[in-house]
């Protein structure tokens, strides 16, 4: 028969092991440079609306489908991969007066926290999009600023699909718009990301 001391030792072992089991559910997902993921920005100024896009997005996401609030991720896109519908404008955008691709070659987006509504379950349902609020950091022109994004997360056995939208300002990232184009370039830039991350 099991004595009291043995029972206590077994109970302690189970309690200590529980956090390890919980952490084991976290999986690392990779965003590959395969054209499936994208980042888009829109400048809606009085005289012109400009849209730019890149499909050169890479990064990693560590997430537990049983508790999506623990998710963390880091993603980047090369500045030189941004494309609008105007080659000359693309050159200016990547130049030292704007995003300065030579000095700051990448734009970064980092997920630091995922927040759900008060009544929302932290566990993702397979193949169903879940609405989330994402807190993180956005780096452009060498300047990092906090961002809050609204979006969705959809999980399958081998993939996480994340969509998020947020707004950044050129002023926050120390990008000065020349007066001659001030009515064609907005200070507030709408950013949206569409990330397909596959399990390692």
Residue ranges and their predicted role:
Residues 1-10:
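Bacterial N-terminal signal peptides that target proteins for export
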Residues 9-19:
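Bacterial N-terminal signal peptides
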């Amino acid at each position: 028969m099991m004595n009291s001391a043995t029972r206590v030792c077994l109970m302690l072992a189970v309690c200590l092991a529980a956090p390890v089991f919980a952490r084991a559910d976290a999986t690392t997902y990779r965003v590959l440079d395969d054209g499936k993921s994208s980042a888009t920005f829109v400048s809606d100024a009085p005289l012109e609306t400009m849209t730019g896009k890149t499909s050169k997005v890479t990064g990693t996401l560590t997430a537990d489908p049983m508790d999506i609030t623990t998710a963390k991720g880091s993603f980047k896109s090369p500045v030189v991969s941004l494309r609008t519908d105007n080659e000359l404008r693309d050159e200016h955008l990547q130049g030292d007066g704007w995003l300065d691709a030579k000095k700051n070659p990448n734009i970064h987006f980092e997920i630091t926290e995922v927040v759900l509504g008060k009544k929302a379950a932290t566990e993702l349902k397979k193949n169903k999009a879940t609405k989330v609020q994402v807190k993180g950091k956005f780096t452009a022109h060498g300047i990092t600023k906090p961002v809050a994004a609204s979006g969705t997360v959809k999980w399958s056995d081998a993939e996480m699909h994340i969509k998020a939208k947020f707004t950044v300002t050129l002023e926050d990232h120390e990008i000065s718009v020349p007066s001659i184009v001030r009515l064609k370039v907005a200070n507030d830039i709408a950013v949206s990301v569409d990330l397909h991350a596959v399990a390692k």
